[in-house]
């Protein structure tokens, strides 16, 4: 198949995806929307309408439990410990600095209810609030620093500028910053006893504003110029002559959508920005109840004195400390050649500013460190995560849950017989043999360790049911395939895939280059982004752009055409996030299979 034909077909698939998502929105089929989000991703044009729907029905929003930066659970003593609120730097539970000194921000700031000397003076409370607002504004404005360097020049030349009246202005930026600040303050007014302010909250708000307009009114016309989003241009790469450069843009100017498709979308927002921001945080900084889980393990395995070793929630999802431990375990197993030099080059000592990338990667789900387009795709996965809709399965992942809300979900898609659904019905990247046939949460499969033992048993004695494939095939034709592993676990393998994708480059990098890469990962989905920006272009503009880019990478000699095969991660030129997701799924299966084999060999 020629490259031109390949990209024409991809353009057709993307157009079909846009139309299908709009139809699912019209039907309020949030179950199918969630499946599309976690497998294919939501088109950038439609995240502003799809994300609120996904968050409205997200299990982690209906029954929330978030990580805390005010207390730390100590598994050795089985007790909580207060963090030092007066410390200039807080260290989170995984042992690395939550906010490096290079940030220059007062990490761990909490809204005060009373003063330190137990006074109830309103003046003290107001002073604390003013100080907190200043910190938040300072952190938010770091996103716009590229604009600040040329703002005065832009203002002075605005009178002679030929920019369109609808072009974003400095005033728009100020309004957006104020909206983001208010969203953060409202979140803290509800959750500050559990989660104090830290710089990550600012960058998570900025990440949301890249896809959901912070100034979106309650009712709107989709042809109005009210869809202002942040465009991710936080680094000053543009020339000084670009006086009208801003950090915001019109969503539909950047990612076009035909008028007849716009007219099918709702014209009322589902949530305000601050409401949506809170729900997003409930998903991204979600954490299981570690203490409760370890107490259950102690109860269910009383004969095992080393019960902590049975805490291995790689399927249900662990706390932040567990995630980082698993990341380095997987990293060292899958990429040993890269792991050792990277560990030597990048000092991973606690309280080191060089570990700040761990904070952004894991605690903040890619905020600041990933490019806007890649982060949006990862957040699609988080927001689209859905376990099998029954009470015991939901409780397996949300081990603290006391609510009953499985009735909110449906197992069958509303348009299950469409060509689109039949094409993508078996598209779960993170599948694993036999895992989907184990009734998670049902005794005896109430802990990850018992599920892994069952996978071991089936592998050891080759007891896979002969009709399991037929059953799965029949099930998939009539029901939605639901998530098997936690989205936070999936993120671990996506990050390892990113490192594998760039392995050859990283092996050649110097220490400073490695640090820059980890804190500012290059875009991974160039082709996807270009495709959606040119989705409705007529002619062969998209094909010419892609073909020219690929031609520049080919060997000059035609005799070498037979060598155009993938010889390493850097040889891939598609730059599609779906390719990266497939790589992450392969790494997940490869790693877990090794774990099973090691346990199998260690058994008597």
Swiss-Prot record:
Subcellular localization(s) per the UniProt record: Cytoplasm
Cytoplasm in keyword set: yes
One annotated Gene Ontology cellular component of this protein: cytoplasm
SMART domains documented for this protein: TBC
Domain (Rab-GAP TBC): residue spans on this chain: 41-386
Gene3D superfamilies to which the protein is assigned, alphabetical: Ypt/Rab-GAP domain of gyp1p, domain 3
InterPro entries listed in its UniProt record: Rab-GAP-TBC_dom, Rab-GAP_TBC_sf
Main localization (coarse): cytoplasm
Top-level taxon of origin: Eukaryota
Keywords associated with the record: Cytoplasm
UniProt family annotation: Belongs to the OCA5 family.
Name of the protein: Oxidant-induced cell-cycle arrest protein 5
The encoding gene: OCA5
